[in-house]
Amino acid sequence: MEDLENKKYWIWFSLIKGLGCVRKNNLLKIYGTPEEIYKLSKRELLKVDGIGEETVTNIIEAKNEKILNYHIKYMEKNNIDIIHICEKSYPQALKQIYDAPASLYIRGNKEILNGKNIGIVGCRECTDYGKKAAKYFAYNLSKEKFVNIVSGLAKGVDSYAHWGSVGANIECESTKNCGKKQESFGKINNNCGKINDDCGKLKNDCGKTIAILGNGLDMIYPKENIELANEIIRNGGTIISEYPCGTKPDKMNFPARNRIISGLSKGIIVIEAKEKSGTLITVDFALEQGRDVFVVPGNINSINSVGTNDLIKQGAKMVTSYEDIK
């Protein structure tokens, strides 16, 4: 991990309240780096188009060395890095969207951010069918197509998608259980007893999973996913957020988080969505960003399938197998 002292101005830039991604990126186009913005006086900042007095006050107040040093030390202690939009390691697909984050906080493997990524989204209160479908697609895309699975670490479909990819990596890594019966994440009917005949594969042979948070990396939300978060990192995946440490989960952050899920991905797979589901926000982002939208058909008698089945009626591509994802 690069010395965070070299990135302290990017950390400072992320701590400014009330300054959104679009205005941050506009400032970067004018001044080049956060360090140059940091040097500006209040009078100079007030001359910048689109920056009002309240925002200027927030920029000046964020120049607090004590708070900045606290963040640097906390990040160093907890293996949290920050990558910025001017770095090669910053996801190039995400860089192309209108409101790309100026920086991303990251724990884990940043090498996968520029890989083959597919998002999986759906209901928090998913049915057993949704659970099995999420595991099935994530497991097989990771194992058979070496695709990284992107999701939001929320309850329901998100969690099962992450677990499906983690399961593929655990199975690929294992060389001790060749020929033994194991639970298969790769069967949509959750049929246990599959023989693992792919033992001996290196962990790197499988796609990983990327979790996007709507809060700082100093906490995992929901708490029940702490174990999952640890398994993601342990198995070569990564957890990222545009929000600095100390940012609590807020309902306003999650729709913004969704644009990163789709922005990082070549396309998204929708598994169960109610008629007015928040999942459909991610679909809207994906369409705006020119991403593919794949939809798993659902039970016509289930409220969890109203949104997904409507998407199919509107022309989204229906998928019933991981092999349908091209």
Annotate each PLM feature:
Residues M1-C86, V295-V296:
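Short, small/acidic-rich helices and loops at N termini and domain boundaries
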Residues E2-L4, K77, H84-K326:
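Glycine-biased, small-residue-rich flexible motifs in mid-sequence functional cores and linkers
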